A protein has these predicted regions:
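C-terminal catalytic histidine-bearing segment of alpha/beta-hydrolase fold enzymes
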Residues: 260-376
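Alpha/beta-hydrolase fold nucleophile elbow
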Residues: 168-179
Length: 376
């Protein structure tokens, strides 16, 4: 009986039942600082009928720049695209932030497309966010120095603030994303960050990070879950791009009531396990596995002294740690690039990973049911 029920779920949420052929979409022509890729995506077959929403956000360097309000020095306009179920009733909304592949994920990633279609079919709205084009990038997978990691999380929180007053929002929100998008999901689960944007201790109701970067993102060393949140951490056990071990360890460190945070490591699955084809070698994808770990204390300062030693004493990029944080507030993108230049000199940056897998239909029911159970 149980096996039959699981089979039914797989059939119900099967991607093969929802025809989708990635369109011939020119991301270069549709992505500029003054033109979000979502403008073009909203006109494609299968994506039309939604609402373009532009909202104010900020560009920061890391969590410390947010804690000390340094991000307020760098306002930016961000574009989101909201797709809602038919009708006029109020619904929950899942906010998607994209991977290092950029907002083109929403077009070319079959799983992202089908997941959104299934959520909408179940009565849950979806908002895509373009974290890159306004910041002068289309993708970052070859060069992660282009856009600081924290900014996808800032955008997601600013989008949540805007959607709280949307006439069709019922006040319940989820968020998800893969890789860099999954990293954003981890960021917004911590009360120390979310409380800078939202009132009180509450944040997203349901958070599902996939294949996040947990060792090099600048997460709090002592994380604490927002009070209203259920979280499901999913990672491929064979992932050599973003390593599962560190996300499992970080999730286990999160201060939260029992049962609020669940971890599912999929043995044998690689990064982008729902790509719809067999794993392949991506030679140009950047990794930082040999660099010193990057976590911060509750004040947002480095917990690993190697970073200050490199920036201040060895490479003399800044006169002091405080001078670095001051520079990071004024020009976060420049400070981020400076950090990558130091890592290149230290020869701790590598390239080459295995990505892909044909696990869409196996994974889809788990993904959809997590949001149904926690938002509907």
């Amino acid at each position: 009986m149980k096996k039959s029920f699981l089979t039914l779920l797989v059939i119900l949420f099967s991607t093969s039942l929802l025809a989708h052929e990635p369109p011939n979409f020119n991301s270069k022509d549709n992505c500029r600082k003054k033109l979000s890729m979502l403008q073009g995506i909203s006109k494609l077959k299968g994506y039309d009928g939604g609402e373009i929403i532009k909202f104010n956000s900020y560009t920061g360097f890391d969590q410390r720049t947010v804690l000390i309000d340094g991000h307020l020095n760098n306002p930016i306009e961000i574009t989101g695209y909201l797709r809602l179920p038919e009708g006029t009733g109020k619904v929950p909304i899942v906010i998607y932030t994209h991977s290092s592949g950029g907002p083109g994920d929403y077009v070319w990633d079959d799983f992202v497309y089908h997941a959104a279609q299934n959520l909408i079919k179940e009565g849950i709205g979806v908002m895509y966010i373009d974290n890159f084009c306004p910041r002068g990038a289309r993708s970052t997978w070859r060069d992660q120095s282009k856009v600081p990691l924290i900014n996808g999380a800032i955008d997601a929180l600013m989008a949540l603030k805007v959607l709280q007053s949307h006439p069709r929002s019922n006040g319940k929100f989820g968020t998800t994303g893969h890789s860099r998008g999954g990293t954003n999901s981890f960021f917004v689960s911590d009360i120390k960050l979310t409380s800078k944007f939202l009132d009180g201790t509450k944040g997203f109701h349901a958070i599902l990070p996939e294949a996040a970067e947990c060792r090099m993102a600048g997460f709090f060393a002592k994380p604490e879950l927002t009070s209203n949140t259920k979280m499901l951490v999913v990672h491929g056990g064979a992932d050599d791009y973003t390593l599962a071990k560190f996300c499992k360890e970080h999730a286990e460190r999160i201060k939260a009531p029992p049962g609020k945070v669940k971890i599912d490591i999929k043995e044998g699955w690689y990064h982008v396990w729902h790509a719809g084809k067999k794993p392949w070698r991506e030679k140009m994808a950047m990794t930082l596995h040999d660099c010193p770990d990057f976590y911060v204390d509750n004040d947002g300062r480095f917990t690993n002294p190697t970073w200050v030693e490199w920036m201040v004493n060895k490479h003399k990029k800044y006169a002091s740690e405080d001078a670095f944080y001051e520079a990071a507030q004024e020009n976060p993108s420049k400070a981020w690039k400076t950090g990558f230049k130091i890592m290149k000199k230290e020869k701790c940056i590598s390239k080459g990973v295995t990505i892909g897998g044909d696990n869409m239909d196996v994974y889809m029911p788990q993904f959809i049911n997590f949001f149904k159970e926690n938002l509907l």
